[in-house]
């Protein structure tokens, strides 16, 4: 019996000690608002940086974001592999009735509360807990203490990073990789999203923003070679969502035309998805009035489509309004989110938006990757934002936490899928065999 228990201990130790994969350095880019067709085959001809990356690595047809196709929900989905109703970051604007605290797209101090962030553990926290060195640049949330942990370094987002900020972040990250100071570097860049909002997804301004990113990425491939990192660094580039055209003043739904705003306890967000908390005793009245409004759908929480993986979120409101593509919901026209244009006044019209049904074509994002663990010149089928996490865990050599991603959708892009498969705890089959053997 002593020999059996000794053998059992050895089996358990060996099974727990299996590595997740080869442990290489990982550089991650989150390019906000980058729609999948911005790098179509035709578009790549005028984007030498992206074209080189595609030829050297993997490009998926498109990436489907989580619902709602907004930034913060997908920032967390990408870094946890979990749907919004699981990680609890369900919007850019949230309200917790129990504490009367609000999350307002990261601009208020209450947005830094663990209340919003501790619903799941993002990859950068897992790596930091594993004694990996994590450097983050402008990444929303890196300044927050999550589950009692902060990354090694966080250059906090305060204003929209410039193209020079972006280039400097890339250069600095590569220097930290070269010196051995970093295991993971994550860089966030927003300008493509900003220009897409202000001028529209097909505008010259959005195209110029993309070309500026392309130039930096072209230099990046050269800098990797100069620092002799090409055999030890994987690079992954993805976006949180796409962008579609909107037409202000033509396709606006003003709630004050249908209901009394005094009958609402709270309203969060404007645009494709709006959250309403009716005042006590007003739920049915508001719901029935809004059911008749064209170009949008009003859902009671329990009736939200299951395919959105949204309704179980703890911060989801009693009523959720979802606009048809291109339509914009607001309390009234005066509260439309104008932006400060060249006049110095907040009077600029928004011409692009996102947040709509995540299955719509214009909401699709991108995923690119290259490096020693990825196939070269490989085109992959579409993936979903929940799938990205497992890829990052695999090439970083870390065991993924339980998640909603599909390994089968991403395994094709890796050179050695067997050694790159996410590590797991001992399987039920192995444990069952051990138990049967002990009882024999």
Curated annotation (Swiss-Prot):
Reaction catalysis annotation: sn-glycerol 3-phosphocholine + H2O = phosphocholine + glycerol + H(+); a 1-acyl-sn-glycero-3-phosphocholine + H2O = a 1-acyl-sn-glycerol + phosphocholine + H(+); a 1-O-alkyl-sn-glycero-3-phosphocholine + H2O = a 1-O-alkyl-sn-glycerol + phosphocholine + H(+); 1-dodecanoyl-sn-glycero-3-phosphocholine + H2O = 1-dodecanoyl-sn-glycerol + phosphocholine + H(+)
Keyword Secreted: no
Family (UniProt): Belongs to the nucleotide pyrophosphatase/phosphodiesterase family.
Name assigned to this protein: Glycerophosphocholine cholinephosphodiesterase ENPP6
Membrane topology: Lipid-anchor; GPI-anchor
Modified residues (Phosphoserine): 71
Record entry for activity regulation: Inhibited by EDTA and EGTA in vitro.
Signal peptide: 1-22
Subunit structure as annotated in this protein's UniProt entry: Homodimer; disulfide-linked. Homotetramer.
Top-level taxonomy: Eukaryota, Metazoa, Chordata, Craniata, Vertebrata
Sorted UniProt keywords: Cell membrane, Disulfide bond, Glycoprotein, GPI-anchor, Hydrolase, Lipid degradation, Lipid metabolism, Lipoprotein, Membrane, Metal-binding, Phosphoprotein, Signal, Zinc
Sample GO molecular function, one term: phosphoric diester hydrolase activity
InterPro entries: Alkaline_phosphatase_core_sf, Phosphodiest/P_Trfase
Cofactors named for this entry: Zn(2+)
Function: Choline-specific glycerophosphodiesterase that hydrolyzes glycerophosphocholine (GPC) and lysophosphatidylcholine (LPC) and contributes to supplying choline to the cells. Has a preference for LPC with short (12:0 and 14:0) or polyunsaturated (18:2 and 20:4) fatty acids. In vitro, hydrolyzes only choline-containing lysophospholipids, such as sphingosylphosphorylcholine (SPC), platelet-activating factor (PAF) and lysoPAF, but not other lysophospholipids.
């Amino acid at each position: 019996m002593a020999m059996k228990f000794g053998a059992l201990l050895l089996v358990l130790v060996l099974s727990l000690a299996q590595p997740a994969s080869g442990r290489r350095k990982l550089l991650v880019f989150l390019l906000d608002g980058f729609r999948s067709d911005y790098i179509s085959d035709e578009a790549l001809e005028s984007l030498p940086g992206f074209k080189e990356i595609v030829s050297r690595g993997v490009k998926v047809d498109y990436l489907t974001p989580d619902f709602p196709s907004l930034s913060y929900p997908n920032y967390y989905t990408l870094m946890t592999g979990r749907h919004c109703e699981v990680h609890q970051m369900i919007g850019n604007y949230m309200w917790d009735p129990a504490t009367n605290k609000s999350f307002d797209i990261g601009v208020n101090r209450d947005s830094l509360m663990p209340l919003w962030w501790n619903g799941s553990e993002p990859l950068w926290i897992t790596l930091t807990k594993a004694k990996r060195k994590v450097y983050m640049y402008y990444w929303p949330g890196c300044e927050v203490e999550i589950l009692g942990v902060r990354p090694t370094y966080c250059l906090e987002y305060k204003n929209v990073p410039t193209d020079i900020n972006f280039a400097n972040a890339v250069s600095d990250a590569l220097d930290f990789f070269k010196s051995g100071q970093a295991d993971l570097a994550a860089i966030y860049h927003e300008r493509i999203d900003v220009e897409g909002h202000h001028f529209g997804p097909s505008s010259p301004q959005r195209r110029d923003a993309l070309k500026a990113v392309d130039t930096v990425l072209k230099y990046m491939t050269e800098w990797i070679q100069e620092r002799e990192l090409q055999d030890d660094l994987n690079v992954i580039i993805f976006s949180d969502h796409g962008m579609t055209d909107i037409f202000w003043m033509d396709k606006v739904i003003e709630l004050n035309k249908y209901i009394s705003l005094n009958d609402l306890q709270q309203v969060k967000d404007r645009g494709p998805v709006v959250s309403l908390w009716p005042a006590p005793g007003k739920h049915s009245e508001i719901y029935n009035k809004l059911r008749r409004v064209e170009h949008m759908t009003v859902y009671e929480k329990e009736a939200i489509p299951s395919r959105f993986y949204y309704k179980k979120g703890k911060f989801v409101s009693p009523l959720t309004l979802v606009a048809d593509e291109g339509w914009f919901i607001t309390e009234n026209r005066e509260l439309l989110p104008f932006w400060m244009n060249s006049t110095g006044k907040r009077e600029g019209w928004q011409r692009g938006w996102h947040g709509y049904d995540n299955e719509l074509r214009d909401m699709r994002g991108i995923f690119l990757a290259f490096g020693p663990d990825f196939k070269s010149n490989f085109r992959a089928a579409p993936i979903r934002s929940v799938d990205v996490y497992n890829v990052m865990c695999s090439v970083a050599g870390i065991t993924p936490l339980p998640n909603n991603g599909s390994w089968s959708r991403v395994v094709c892009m890796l050179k050695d899928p067997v050694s790159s498969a996410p590590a797991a705890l001992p399987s039920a089959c192995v444990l069952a065999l051990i138990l049967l053997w002990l009882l024999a």
